[in-house]
Amino acid sequence: TLIHEWAESVIGDQYPVPDRILHFTELIVQDYLAQEMCDRRPPKGTFDLFATEGGTAAMCYLFDSLQENFLLNQGDAIALMIPVFTPYIEIPELRRYQFDVTEISADQMTPDGLHTWQYKDEDIDKLKDPRIKALFITNPSNPPSYALSKETTERIINIVKNDNPNLMIITDDVYGTFIPHFRSLMAELPHNTLCVYSFSKYFGATGWRTAV
């Protein structure tokens, strides 16, 4: 039962089974992500969940796993949508990765000269290049905290479906719960997307170090 599972995990008297995330905890988190990351309209099936000790740890595991499984190799081309959480800038520069990074900047302006923190179509179209194997994005952005516009989201979806179907998307949606009716790219492109979500920001519990 749920209470038995939680009691054993608090006591820590044995290894967790399954080791990636506890059974009943996974069911709860699946529903939570469907509500908060998919605006209550999740894709068919279920997400493969892995509990981690915080969002930053999840990032490190993702980079490592992508390379160890030969999905990304040293020197491969990736795209980075900026502004972005700082480690996404620093990790690709490490010697073991040395990725060829294409930066896509949120520098779209209004006619009045105000910053919208959104992306130009011609910059998003860089993702059509099949040499770009992965796209890293913080959505909503960090620190501006603006979610991708509907138009940009649809453009990325069309690029994946029509131009670069093997593009891997790594989206860090930690602040998604602060956006009304937020819908992650993992809800739109579940077979291409790896999502990092941390509970710490929304629940004000950064010291807990809990994420999926």
How does the language model describe each region?
Residues H4-N164, G176-P190, L194:
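Conserved core of the PLP fold type I
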Residues I169-I170:
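Residue-level marker for buried hydrophobic side chains located in beta-strands
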Residues D173:
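Walker B catalytic acidic pair
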Residues E188-V212:
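Active-site PLP attachment segment
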